[in-house]
Amino acid sequence: MDEDVLTTLKILIIGESGVGKSSLLLRFTDDTFDPELAATIGVDFKVKTISVDGNKAKLAIWDTAGQERFRTLTPSYYRGAQGVILVYDVTRRDTFVKLDNWLNELETYCTRNDIVNMLVGNKIDKENREVDRNEGLKFARKHSMLFIEASAKTCDGVQCAFEELVEKIIQTPGLWESENQNKGVKLSHREESRGGGACGGYCSVL
């Protein structure tokens, strides 16, 4: 690991098929958007290093297929994850209703009890909304999750989602400090004195 990188974090993106998980990932890592992007087969994987409040973190981001036939990949996919982005489509209520199923899966297979979860309502650029923002916020509060609405197409909220998730993980040293205890790394003073969220009105730390 690079000396100036605080830690490497495993981040998962989960949710029903077609909610835009891969599009969010590609917008964040490559700043691209493909409206004809094919459904993920199995698991996709990308790496990106970001800086949050003076601390560099290398993100290993896992994007999984939402289809039921790929669920045999689940146990290894969740193992060792420090953060999860749970995505639904604000124009498809069925993807919101099924969030409980994904949370149950997360609780079943996740190996950490202090993992940081972020709920993302994607596709806010579309007009045919079926899930109100307050519904998403209420669900996130109920399950102690971070929350944001976003659009992979317009880039709205995408960077914020990942940065807020990483910030919260870094503020939870138990998630990563054991991996770095022999490297002498520590948080920057900016992070130690960190107050509110970096994304203004977008994210709610709950």
UniProtKB/Swiss-Prot annotation:
Keywords: Acetylation, Cell membrane, Developmental protein, Endoplasmic reticulum, Golgi apparatus, GTP-binding, Hydrolase, Lipid droplet, Lipoprotein, Magnesium, Membrane, Metal-binding, Methylation, Nucleotide-binding, Palmitate, Phosphoprotein, Prenylation, Protein transport, Transport. Expression is high in the brain, moderate in the pituitary, and low in the liver. Detected in all tissues. Highly enriched on apical endocytic structures in polarized epithelial cells of kidney proximal tubules. Detected on both the apical and basolateral domains in epithelial cells of the intestine. Its EC number is 3.6.5.2. Interacts (in GTP-bound form) with ZFYVE1. Interacts with ZW10 and this interaction is enhanced in the presence of ZFYVE1. Interacts with BSCL2. The modification Phosphoserine is found at residue 144. It is an enzyme of class 3 (hydrolase). Mg(2+) binds at residues 22, 40. Transmembrane segments: none annotated. InterPro entries: P-loop_NTPase, Rab, Sigma_54_int_dom_ATP-bd_1, Small_GTP-bd, Small_GTPase. This is Ras-related protein Rab-18. Regulated by guanine nucleotide exchange factor (GEF) RAB3GAP1-RAB3GAP2 complex at the cis-Golgi membrane which promotes the exchange of bound GDP for free GTP. Regulated by GTPase activating protein (GAP) TBC1D20 at the ER membrane which increases the GTP hydrolysis activity. Inhibited by GDP dissociation inhibitors (GDIs) which prevent Rab-GDP dissociation. A motif (Switch 2) lies at residues 63-80. It catalyses: GTP + H2O = GDP + phosphate + H(+). A lipid is attached at residue 199 (S-palmitoyl cysteine). PANTHER family: RAS-RELATED PROTEIN RAB (PTHR47977). The modification Cysteine methyl ester is found at residue 203. The modification N-acetylmethionine is found at residue 1. It comes from the Eukaryota. It is found in: Endoplasmic reticulum membrane; Golgi apparatus, cis-Golgi network membrane; Lipid droplet; Apical cell membrane. The gene is Rab18. Residues 204-206 form a propeptide. GO terms for molecular function: GDP binding; GTP binding; GTPase activity. GO terms for cellular component: apical plasma membrane; cis-Golgi network membrane; endoplasmic reticulum membrane; lipid droplet. It comes from Mus musculus. The small GTPases Rab are key regulators of intracellular membrane trafficking, from the formation of transport vesicles to their fusion with membranes. Rabs cycle between an inactive GDP-bound form and an active GTP-bound form that is able to recruit to membranes different sets of downstream effectors directly responsible for vesicle formation, movement, tethering and fusion. RAB18 is required for the localization of ZFYVE1 to lipid droplets and for its function in mediating the formation of endoplasmic reticulum-lipid droplets (ER-LD) contacts.
